Amino acid sequence: MPLPEPSEQEGESVKAGQEPSSKPGTEVVPAAPRKPREFSKLVLLTASKDSTKVAGAKRKGVHCVMSLGVPGPATLAKALLQTHPEAQRAIEAAPQEPEQKRSRQDPGADRTEDSGLAAGPPEAAGENSAPCSVAPGKSL
C-alpha cells in the first residue's frame, strides 16, 4: 500500500492562517492575548528634608514612608496600617498574648537578655536608632 506524499499530509493538517511546520506535531499555536493587570495604588517611598514636599504628597492621597535607618516592627506596622485599612483591622483584632506574657516576667530577666529584639518599640529610643549587628566600617 503506497504512503501519501509528505506535501499531502501537511496540506491536510495545516489550518487556515498557519504556516506548515517542518516537523509533524510541532505546530505553534499563538497564545491568547491577555488583559493587562490592574495594580492598586503603589506606595511612594521618598526621603526628603523638605517637609512641604512630604505634606503635599500626603494631601494628594499618596502615602509616604520615610526611613533612614533599620526599620523596626513598629515602623513597619505603622507603614502597613497607613497603606492598607484592611490590614489595620486585622492587626487590631489580633490577640496580644506575647506582650502580656513578657510583662509578667521578672523585671531582672530583661537585664540578662542581650538581644535587640527584647527591647521596647523603636519609638522609645528614637525612630532611627534601631540596633545594628554590623560593626561600623563593615558592609553586609
UniProtKB/Swiss-Prot annotation:
The stretch of residues making up the signal peptide is: none
Tell me the keywords, alphabetical order: Phosphoprotein
Show the ranges annotated as biased composition (Basic and acidic residues).
98-114
Q: Which InterPro entries match?
A: FLYWCH_N, FWCH1/FWCH2
In this UniProt entry, the residues modified to Phosphoserine are 21
Which ranges of the sequence are coiled-coil?
A: none
From the UniProt entry, list the residue stretches annotated as the region Disordered.
1-39, 83-140
List the biased-composition ranges (Low complexity): 118-127
Q: What is this protein called?
A: FLYWCH family member 2
Q: Which organism is it from?
A: Pongo abelii
Show the taxonomic lineage. Eukaryota, Metazoa, Chordata, Craniata, Vertebrata
Protein's gene = FLYWCH2
